[in-house]
């Protein structure tokens, strides 16, 4: 959502391999912050083995398992918990898991043990790192797809969800999803040491999440999508007010004349750590998302905006994509806007440009 720090250039390359029953995906990145040396990094996105036994299929390793309906937000994405609306679409880093699935002509059942290695009593560093058991049941009934979900997390306990997607006409598709959680994980400023990140993932009370959406596709490959959702696991308005107050206090401290260099560096570090809670699936609890697109032969043009009614903040994106047999080129621009009191106006980066070239071989 928030993009790279100001003045930062990044290059990414994604490599995939498939050998017998083993699949792998590796992401190579090179990041060059303004005025600093380039940093290279390699990360295994997926590495898992598949097997079959009767009507069941099994996967073991690090794998992406994405559930639920919806584009801008997915309440029942209880395994992968993938970041949505990213500027560049790459394979996310899968979760360590053991997956068992069975398929019928119109049904499917999936059972997952995710993050089995995470058995600590303290809350995980991110919500997606929690050890949990999850299950999904899927049924297709004509033009309607039905989903039921259940999850038991080590820290968040029980959650139940349901989703439906219905192709109402040749041009119109409707979808909805809802989830109730006994507990949820959220960022809280719990630390006090000046040399440590004060933000910690903490267990909070019950939360509800839901999404309503519609997608229209025209005869000339033009499309319009509208989604409205509530994310009860996002920080509430009072929490963001405290976040802004802390931002202001740190900026005022950094501007004090005669502040020692050591203290100034400490304040700069605290300001950098203020970006920690910005990585959630939703910044505000209530959101409206609109996306328009048009495809003609090898070209696809798209525009979308995420609107947050709480403070009238907006995140808008325009993109153009050209695709041939082996190449896909993408140019995109994202802008964060809104009035001065909007959360998006306080974020460190307001504009992000992207050029991506993908070669399949």
What are these language model-derived features?
Residues 5-13, 40-45, 92-96, 103, ...:
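Residues that define the transmembrane beta-barrel architecture of outer-membrane proteins
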Residues 290, 327-329, 335, 347-361:
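Outer-membrane beta-barrel "beta-signal"
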Residues 16-116, 338:
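Outer membrane beta-barrel
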Residues 1, 24-34, 80-83, 109-117, ...:
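Transmembrane beta-strand segments that form the barrel wall of outer-membrane beta-barrel proteins
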Residues 15-19, 50-53, 101-104, 137-141, ...:
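Residue-level signature of outer-membrane beta-barrel architecture
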Residues 140-144, 165-305:
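Detector for outer-membrane/organellar transmembrane beta-barrel domains
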């Amino acid at each position: 959502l928030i993009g790279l720090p100001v003045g930062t250039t990044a290059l990414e390359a994604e490599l995939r391999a498939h050998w017998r029953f083993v699949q792998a995906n590796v992401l190579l990145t090179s990041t060059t912050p303004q005025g600093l040396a380039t940093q290279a990094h390699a990360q295994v996105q997926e590495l898992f083995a598949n097997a079959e036994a009767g009507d069941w299929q099994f996967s073991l390793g690090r794998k992406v398992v994405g559930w639920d309906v919806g584009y801008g937000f997915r309440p029942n994405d209880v395994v992968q918990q993938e970041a949505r609306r990213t500027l560049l679409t790459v394979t996310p880093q899968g979760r360590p898991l053991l997956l068992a699935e069975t398929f019928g002509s119109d049904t499917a059942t999936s059972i997952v043990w995710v993050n089995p290695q995470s058995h600590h009593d303290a809350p995980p560093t991110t919500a997606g790192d929690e050890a949990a058991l999850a299950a999904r049941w899927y049924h297709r009934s004509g033009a309607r797809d039905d989903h039921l979900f259940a999850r038991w997390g080590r820290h968040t306990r029980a959650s139940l969800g349901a989703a439906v997607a219905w192709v109402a006409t040749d041009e119109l598709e409707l979808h909805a999803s809802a989830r109730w959680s006994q507990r949820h994980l959220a960022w809280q400023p719990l630390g006090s040491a000046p040399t440590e990140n004060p933000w910690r993932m903490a267990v909070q009370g019950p939360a509800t999440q839901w999404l309503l959406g519609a997608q229209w596709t025209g005869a000339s490959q033009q499309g319009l999508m509208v989604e409205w959702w509530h994310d009860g696991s996002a920080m509430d308005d009072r929490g963001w007010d405290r976040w802004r107050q802390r931002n202001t206090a740190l900026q005022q401290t950094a501007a004090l004349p005669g502040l020692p260099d050591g203290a100034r560096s400490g304040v700069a570090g605290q300001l950098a750590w203020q970006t920690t809670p910005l990585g959630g699936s939703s910044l505000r609890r209530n959101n409206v998302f609109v996306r328009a697109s048009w495809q003609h032969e090898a070209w696809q043009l798209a525009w979308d905006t995420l609107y947050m009614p709480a403070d009238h903040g907006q995140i808008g994106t325009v993109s153009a994509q050209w695709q041939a047999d082996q190449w896909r080129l993408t140019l995109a621009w994202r802008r964060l806007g809104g009035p001065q009191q909007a959360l998006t106006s306080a974020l460190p980066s307001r504009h992000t440009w992207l050029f991506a070239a993908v070669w399949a071989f």
